[in-house]
Structures are given as structure tokens and as C-alpha cells.
From Swiss-Prot:
Keywords in alphabetical order: Activator, Differentiation, Metal-binding, Nucleus, Transcription, Transcription regulation, Zinc, Zinc-finger
Feature: compositional bias, Low complexity: 369-380
Protein name in the entry: Zinc finger protein 750
Name of the coding gene: znf750
Pfam families: zf-C2H2_7 (PF15269)
Length: 607
């Protein structure tokens, strides 16, 4: 056996401890270490020592195998030869001294029956001690490298631990007779305030909820399902009692309701202080939503806005769209109202300056146009009796004075302009040109001009003659008395009415100031754009056909067609120059006014 111990084994997978050097650390046999603490810490960091100890104890409990080591010579491990030295180092010093003395006596002294008896008596005691120590070592040993080598105190603790585990394998809750019932304290949780009792103070006859059951009630389940008669619904006591004194006159064992009240009905609770009922309409009003939406058409019906003041242009656009629902063919730009001259990302200057008067002009034009159509239906021939109601509230006395004044005034230049108008209208009726002012029935149109147009012409001249000043063509915001009457009728009709009234009624000349103003204004309006001419020609045809068939034209068409004419006229008038007399207009018109009108429109946008 000494030869086996002296032979060096194969190189193990771990570095063994040197034979004469005592180990310092709890876990020596690690795959990482010899005696260096840094290597050992890597093993102890992952709790491999505790896992190996628990695995050894469980395996020894399951198998119950004892070590095959001999009684005198310790077991030899195939991993290393230093394991017996480790096992011997863990033995108590007293046992080592006794073993040495016994071996010396057996070798030196001769054999005798008396000595043999004494030796036989001592050997069972030694064998019992060796077996107990071998069992302790074998429980901690395993063939793997993770078998720990513990100290004497730890080996004793480990040897006692499986016996304790055997006793406590059954849970305490399922034991019929629990060993800790008598030693357990039945102290209850104290309330935070000693004056006030807790929610339920149990009686001595009742078992407490959190104390262990006595021996006679061990068979009962842990949780009692059926409530007892003495148990009542737990109501917490109020923090501040209604009594004047802070202390109760007597303690409540159970929390009773101090103020008995009937049970609350299961219905909708109506607070007495609320005057407004809580049950309201399920839908919010449209005012909440419509402040940010743009007015739109749904099937020909316009949905108005409830808060139009949130946008600056909504009032004008809505008025334009109300007139525009009748004819879907004519479409203007929604932000400009007249044409798409302005760029989409920035407004034009004409649009900014004319913002306020446009909405007023549209409203006033509706009244004046309705008044003018009533004159067409009546068919009366007196211009003085059929004066329309002016939107600005002008006196009719001034109008009568103006009519008397213009009955005695005509000019030769106006006659020539009227003749040239008729010749040009006959030419433009055959070819579709930019300036189409054709009248199919001259008789009906002449009658119409006697009935309808003089009122408009007198209205315009009355306004222009109040201030004996040159014509103001700027786009600044004008007063309502000056801005509104200009839009009562299209400028083409005004110029035609000026010419026709002057030829039929009086043979005298106009004043030079009035002649210059009317000529310049008519020239500016005629040269504005092609759309104005087309709209006016269509409108005149509608008026003549309606008088023949006694059908009224829709007010929507007229009002919508007038609104872009006004804005176009005001925009083009920025860069215009006044002409001196009427015949210049006809010479330019016969030479195709298309080319000079284009740079004028561009100049008006830049102003």
C-alpha cells in the first residue's frame, strides 16, 4: 500500500496543493486554483463550492453508500495522492495520538491472550471512531474535482445537517402535531393608537386568524370558509369620532355604523348642489368643431360657418360661393375671388387693399340689382319715377336735379361715339373677338337702355360730380358713399348708357370735367381683360331674351359676374393713364386691343 501511495498519479486537471503546506481557504479542490486567492475567488464568485456541498449531501442521502477506504489506511483517490493527507489533517489531534500509541504497542510488545483481549477491546472503539470519521469524510467527498475539504467544525455541522433535514422534510403546515405550537407566541399586532381598537379584536374563545391552531383543531383546514355567527362585516372606525371628547366612552369590539342610514338606491346619483342636470346631449355642438373648417358644398347646398371671423377672407368667399352655386361652369380662384392672377403663396397688393369694400359691395349690389330688375318687369318709361333705392341712403332730390340737368345736355362727340358703338357691335357680332358687345335686338336694347341704364348712369354721375376733382383710380380703401355706387353695374353698360342717353334726350354738350372722367373710366374698364367683355355680352343676351320671353334672369348669375369685374377693374386701374376723349377708344379698339392689354395687366400686378 505504501507503493501505491508513493507512486505519482497522472497529471490531474487541477493543480493540487503542495503536500506539506496547509490550506488556507474553504474550498481547496477547485479546477482553477492551487493556493492562490485570485484563482480561488473566481470559483467562489459563482457559488460553486456551495453547489458542490449540497450535491454531495443529497447524493449520500439517496445512495447511502459508505466509503471503501480501509480502517487503518485512508482511502486513495485517483485524482491526487494528497487527498489522504487532507483527510488526516482534518482528524482531531487526540485521535491521531491514540492511533500512534496503539500501533507502537502492537508492533513492539509480544502477543499474549491478555493483551489480545485488551487489544480487542480497544479496537472496536477505534473502529467506531474511524467509521464515523470515514462517513463524515465520504459524505463530503466525490470523485469530481468539486469535492470540498472542510474543517473539523464544518464537517461536524455537515454531518449533523442531514439528520436535521430528515426531521423537517414534511412541511409544518401539514403536520398533525406541530412541534412549534407550544413555543409559538400568541402576541397580536398592537394598534398604532392605543385608545382606538383595531378593526377586529378577537375573543379568547375564537382562534386568532394569524396564530397556529391548537392540537385539537389540527385536522381543520387552514382557511375557514363558512363564517361564524359572531363574525360581522368589518367597518373601519372613523379617525375622528363625532363625540366632543377624543376618547370613546366605550370600545367597539366590532366596527358598527354610527349613523344608521337606508341603503343607497342603485340609480344615477344627482348631486343636490348641481342645478344643471348631468344627463346632457350625447353630441357636442357644432361650434366646437366648425371654427377651423372651410365652408364647403355638399350636393349644391352650402354649409355655412358658425365662426367666420377666424379667417379674414371667409366672409367674401362665402358670398361669392353663394352666388356661384347656380352655375358650376364659371369658377374663380377661391382666395382671390376674381381670377388667378395672384401667386398661391403670397397675396397680391390689390387683394389686400380691396378686402373690406368687396364684402360691402357684394351686399349692396344684391339690393341694387334686385331693384333694377323690378324696373324691367314694370316696363315703365319714366326714369324719374323708377329711381332705385340707393344702398347708401342718398336723397332722391339730388337725383331729380341731376336728371333735369342731363336732359338739357348732349354732345356731338357722344353722338359719334354712339354711332361707332353700333358699327363696332355689328362687326364683333360676326366674329368672336375679345370685345364682344353685340346686341341682337336693337329696339329692345334701346328700350331697355331708356328704362334701365339711365338710372345707373345718373347714379354714377351724381357721385362723380359731388367732388369736382380728377378721377381717383387708386386702390385704397374708399368710403362707403364712394365705393358702393361704382359697382352697381358693369362699366360697359355705364359707357353705353352715357352715349345713348346723351343722343336721345338733349342736344347740348357735357361739361369737360364729366366728359374726361367718364371717358377715362370707360377706357380703363374696357381694356381690363377679355373675361369682362365675355361676361357682359352673355349678360346682355340674357337680359334681352328674358324681356322677350318674360322670364327673369337668376340674380345669382348677375351678382357673381359683377364681382370679378369690379376687382379686375380696380386691379388694372393701377397702371392706367387717362385718355382725353372718347374717339381714341374706338380707334384703339378696331386695331385689336389684345396686345396692349397684356403689358397693362402685368404692370398692375407689380404696382
Amino acid at each position: 500500500m505504501e507503493t501505491l501511495q508513493g507512486r505519482k498519479p497522472k497529471k490531474p486537471h487541477y493543480i493540487p496543493r503542495p503536500p506539506g503546506k496547509p490550506f488556507k481557504y474553504q474550498c481547496f479542490q477547485c479546477p482553477f486554483t492551487c493556493n492562490i486567492k485570485s484563482h480561488l475567488f473566481n470559483h467562489m464568485k459563482y457559488n460553486l463550492c456551495k453547489n458542490s456541498i449540497s450535491l454531495v449531501s443529497q447524493r449520500m442521502e439517496q445512495t447511502g453508500k459508505a466509503s471503501r477506504a480501509s480502517q487503518h489506511s485512508p482511502a486513495f483517490s485517483h485524482n491526487s495522492k494528497e487527498l489522504p493527507l487532507d483527510a488526516e489533517s482534518t482528524k482531531p489531534i487526540e485521535n491521531v495520538k491514540i492511533e500512534k500509541a496503539v500501533t507502537k504497542e502492537a508492533r513492539e510488545k509480544p502477543q499474549s491472550p491478555i493483551k489480545e483481549v485488551s487489544k480487542d477491546d480497544t479496537e472496536p472503539a477505534l473502529e467506531a471512531k474511524d467509521k464515523s470519521e470515514d462517513m463524515d469524510i465520504a459524505q463530503n467527498k466525490i470523485s469530481s474535482a468539486f469535492s470540498p475539504v472542510a474543517r473539523t467544525c464544518e464537517s461536524e455541522a455537515l454531518s449533523l445537517s442531514p439528520h436535521k433535514d430528515d426531521q423537517s422534510t414534511i412541511p409544518h403546515f401539514y403536520q398533525q402535531i406541530a412541534p412549534w405550537v407550544t413555543s409559538a407566541s400568541s402576541a397580536h399586532l398592537l394598534p398604532p393608537i392605543p385608545e382606538y381598537p383595531p378593526y377586529m379584536v378577537p375573543e379568547r374563545s375564537l382562534p386568532p386568524l394569524y396564530a397556529p391552531y391548537p392540537h385539537n383543531q389540527a385536522s381543520t383546514p387552514a382557511y375557514q370558509v363558512t363564517p361564524r355567527e359572531t363574525q360581522r362585516p368589518l367597518v373601519p372606525s372613523p379617525l375622528i369620532p363625532p363625540n366632543s371628547s377624543l376618547l370613546h366612552p366605550y370600545h367597539y369590539r366590532y366596527g358598527h355604523s354610527i349613523f344608521p342610514s337606508p341603503p343607497l338606491p342603485y340609480s344615477f346619483y344627482q348631486h343636490p348642489e348641481l342645478s344643471i342636470p348631468l344627463q346632457r346631449s350625447r353630441y357636442l355642438p357644432l361650434d366646437v368643431y366648425s371654427s377651423r373648417f372651410y365652408p364647403r358644398e355638399y350636393g349644391g347646398h352650402l354649409v355655412p360657418l358658425t365662426h367666420p371671423e377666424s379667417y379674414s377672407r371667409l366672409a367674401e368667399d362665402r358670398a361669392v360661393q353663394e352666388h356661384n352655386t347656380g352655375d358650376k361652369g364659371i369658377r374663380e380662384s377661391p382666395l382671390e375671388g376674381c381670377d388667378a392672377s395672384g401667386s398661391p403663396d403670397r397675396p397680391s397688393t390689390a387683394d389686400v387693399t380691396q378686402r373690406i369694400p368687396v364684402g360691402l359691395r357684394l351686399a349692396s349690389h344684391g339690393e341694387s340689382h334686385s331693384g333694377s330688375q323690378s324696373h324691367i318687369i314694370s316696363g315703365s318709361t319714366k326714369a324719374n319715377d323708377n329711381l332705385p333705392k340707393m344702398p347708401c341712403g342718398q336723397n332722391q332730390e339730388k337725383m331729380l336735379q341731376k336728371t333735369e340737368r342731363y336732359d338739357s345736355q348732349t354732345t356731338i362727340s357722344s353722338r359719334s361715339s354712339d354711332i361707332s358703338d353700333k358699327e363696332e357691335d355689328e362687326e364683333t357680332e360676326e366674329e368672336i373677338g375679345p370685345l364682344n358687345l353685340s346686341k341682337r335686338d336693337q329696339a329692345t336694347s334701346n328700350n331697355m337702355t331708356h328704362h334701365h341704364y339711365p338710372d345707373r348712369e345718373l347714379h354714377y354721375d351724381s357721385e362723380s360730380s359731388q367732388e369736382e376733382a380728377p378721377l381717383n383710380l387708386c386702390l385704397r380703401v374708399q368710403s362707403s358713399n364712394q365705393a358702393l355706387p361704382n359697382t352697381s353695374e358693369t362699366p360697359e353698360k355705364e359707357t353705353i348708357s352715357n352715349a345713348e342717353v346723351s343722343t336721345t334726350e338733349s342736344p347740348q354738350d357735357l361739361e369737360p370735367c364729366d366728359q374726361r372722367q367718364t371717358a377715362a373710366f370707360a377706357l380703363c374698364q374696357l381694356a381690363s381683360s377679355r373675361d369682362i367683355i365675355n361676361d357682359t355680352s352673355v349678360k346682355q343676351q340674357d337680359v334681352t331674351e328674358s324681356q322677350n320671353t318674360k322670364c327673369l334672369p337668376s340674380p345669382d348669375n348677375c351678382s357673381v359676374k359683377d364681382s370679378p369685374n369690379i376687382l379686375n377693374a380696380s386691379m388694372v386701374a393701377l397702371g392706367q393713364k387717362r385718355a382725353n376723349n372718347r374717339p381714341l377708344r374706338h380707334t384703339n379698339k378696331r386695331a385689336k386691343v389684345k396686345e396692349p392689354s397684356r403689358p397693362r395687366r402685368k404692370r398692375s400686378q407689380n404696382c
